[in-house]
């Protein structure tokens, strides 16, 4: 991986004057697509959920979540039932959202989204997305903008190869080539901020899939002793590249959630009972 990879960023802010509308970090993956990450601005949630959170699994008030979700759907021009997010559990499980999904009952849909950390679809006017607050969100699209994916890659999912699983499932299911995919790695914790224990380093090293000298370094901790830091941006970049995506097809937002917790939710800064970034992608 070249040393210049971190310069491959796309930071286009879409700022709205109306404070009750979400402010989005948008990604240019093609004119037929809408890809973005929400910021903390533009919603009605309070305290550590302020102000734009649509995740129902982190302790926010249900009415605030409903209002925020409706505001995002209004911005996207879709109905709330066309915004799909899984109940993530740090797995490497990938789910395809197709016509059969919508033909199933609400209970069946909920069950299908349980324990899933990546979604893929070829459906139009359907926004799929994942929730993060330091973990890495990744969005994918093929060059013809026919199929899209959203991936939640925490350290466990990254180590387990969820990005590779998503690429493989996307290509196999829809007869695509990895070389024709584009990817964006969204706001998440940087290596400098992501201090980990020896067990996390060992988990990555044990896979044999990661060049540890490129994704891990030791820095002095607050206590003085050196601790391992893992570069999740680099780990996911390398995984995508190993899958066959050309490096020039992989953009990195370069936004560290830990450093910019005033704009993006960070669980390490705010605690686990706080809001989540929603990173979504849809075919218009």
Please annotate each region the language model reported.
Residues 2-284:
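Active-site microenvironment for binding and transforming phosphate-containing groups
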């Amino acid at each position: 991986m070249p040393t210049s990879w971190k310069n491959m960023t796309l930071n286009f802010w879409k700022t709205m004057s109306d404070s009750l509308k979400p402010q989005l970090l948008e990604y240019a993956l093609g004119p037929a697509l809408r890809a973005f990450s929400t910021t903390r601005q533009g919603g009605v949630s309070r305290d550590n959920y302020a102000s734009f959170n649509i995740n129902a699994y982190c302790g926010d008030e249900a009415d605030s979540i409903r209002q925020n979700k409706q505001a995002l759907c209004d911005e996207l021009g879709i109905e709330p039932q066309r915004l799909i997010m899984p109940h993530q559990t740090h797995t490497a499980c990938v789910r395809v959202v197709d016509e059969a999904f919508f033909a199933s009952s609400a209970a069946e849909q909920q069950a299908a989204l349980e324990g899933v950390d990546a979604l893929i679809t070829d459906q139009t006017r359907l926004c799929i997305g994942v929730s993060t607050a330091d973990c890495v969100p990744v969005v994918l699209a093929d060059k013809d903008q026919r199929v899209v994916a959203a991936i939640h890659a925490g350290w466990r999912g990254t180590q387990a190869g969820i990005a590779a699983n998503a690429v493989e499932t996307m290509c196999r299911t829809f007869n695509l080539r990895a070389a024709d995919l584009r990817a964006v790695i969204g706001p998440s914790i940087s290596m400098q901020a992501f201090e980990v224990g020896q067990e996390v380093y060992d988990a990555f090293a044990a896979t044999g899939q990661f060049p540890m000298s490129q994704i891990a370094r030791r820095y002095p901790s607050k206590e003085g002793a050196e601790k391992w830091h893992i570069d999740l941006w680099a780990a996911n970049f390398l995984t995508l590249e190993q899958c066959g995506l050309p490096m020039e097809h992989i953009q990195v937002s370069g936004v560290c959630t830990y450093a910019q917790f005033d704009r993006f939710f960070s669980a390490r800064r705010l605690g686990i009972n706080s809001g989540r970034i929603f990173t979504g992608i849809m075919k218009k």
